[in-house]
């Protein structure tokens, strides 16, 4: 009897008739951990991550996935690799403590890839990538996901964050990059070096970046915010709508289309058209 703890929730307005029984001495909950290693036979260059926990992605000479976690979490994880895509998913765990996920339900994933051209990340997990050197890369982060890049070099790059997702990039070098945020998501680039960049924000999205760009196309609407005040751009083409806010910097030429109670602030020596 002492090995079990019975908690009776008496606050009916919050939880009606709820009884939670937890055996804190059950080792399967706390210290029954294991590891799975899987060699990926196909040439994977696309990754879909829909599991709890953290995925680490590094570039290497082989395609290999290693997973560490409690046995119960490992049993919930499914890995499918076919047609050049790797899908990592996890069954929903309905057992929670007052809405908080039970300890041990998350795993740690270590993925080594020769090349990466597409990443789709959704859910409450976290993905940490880099350093990466690729030709083209498309990233979609959604559903409260957190996607972090250390160092990224890509000739052609597209990143989209939506539905409260967060994307953070330490250093980015690219010929052409497009960064898009909407639905309360945000993207933050600490240091970018790019020839041409497209910045698009809508529906309370937040986009911040610093660095250098030859040409910047900036579009914001529906209460979104773009802070490119620390981005040294030669040419800027800018349009704002519906209470959006934009801060930018231009040194040769700037064109502004500002409407619907939006706000634009810019610095530099550019000629305004």
Language-model features, listed with the residues they occupy:
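Short flexible/disordered coil segments
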Residues: 146-148, 155, 186-190
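Sec-dependent bacterial lipoprotein signal peptides
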Residues: 1-18
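A short, structured loop/turn motif at beta-sheet edges
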Residues: 82-84, 145, 221, 241
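Acidic (Asp/Glu) and glycine-rich low-complexity loops/linkers
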Residues: 18-50, 54-122, 126-141, 148-160, ...
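Internal active-site segments that recognize and position negatively charged phosphoryl groups
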Residues: 165
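Short, surface-exposed interaction patches in beta-rich subdomains
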Residues: 169-180, 184-273
């Amino acid at each position: 009897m002492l090995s079990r703890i019975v908690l009776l929730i008496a606050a009916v307005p919050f939880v009606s008739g709820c009884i939670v029984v937890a055996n804190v001495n059950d080792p399967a909950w706390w210290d029954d951990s294991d590891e799975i290693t899987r060699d990926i036979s196909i040439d994977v260059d696309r990754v879909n991550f829909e599991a709890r926990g953290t995925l680490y992605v590094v570039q290497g000479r082989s395609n290999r996935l290693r997973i560490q976690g409690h046995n119960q979490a490992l049993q919930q994880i499914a890995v499918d690799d076919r047609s050049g895509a790797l899908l990592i998913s996890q069954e929903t765990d309905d057992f929670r403590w007052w809405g908080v996920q039970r300890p041990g339900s998350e795993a740690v994933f270590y993925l080594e890839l020769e090349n990466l051209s597409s990443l789709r990340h959704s859910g409450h997990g976290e993905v940490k990538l880099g350093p990466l050197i690729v030709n083209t890369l498309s990233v979609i982060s959604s559903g409260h996901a957190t996607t972090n890049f250390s160092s990224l070099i890509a000739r052609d790059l597209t990143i989209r964050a939506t539905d409260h997702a967060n994307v953070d990039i330490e250093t980015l070098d690219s010929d052409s990059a497009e960064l898009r945020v909407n639905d309360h998501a945000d993207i933050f680039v600490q240091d970018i070096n790019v020839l041409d960049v497209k910045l698009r924000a809508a529906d309370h999205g937040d986009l911040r970046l610093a660095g250098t760009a030859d040409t910047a196309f900036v579009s914001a609407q529906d209460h979104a915010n773009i802070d490119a005040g620390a981005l040294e751009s030669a040419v800027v083409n800018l349009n704002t709508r519906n209470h959006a806010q934009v801060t930018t910097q231009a040194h040769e030429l700037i064109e502004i289309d500002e409407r619907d109670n939006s706000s634009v602030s810019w610095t530099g020596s550019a000629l305004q058209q």
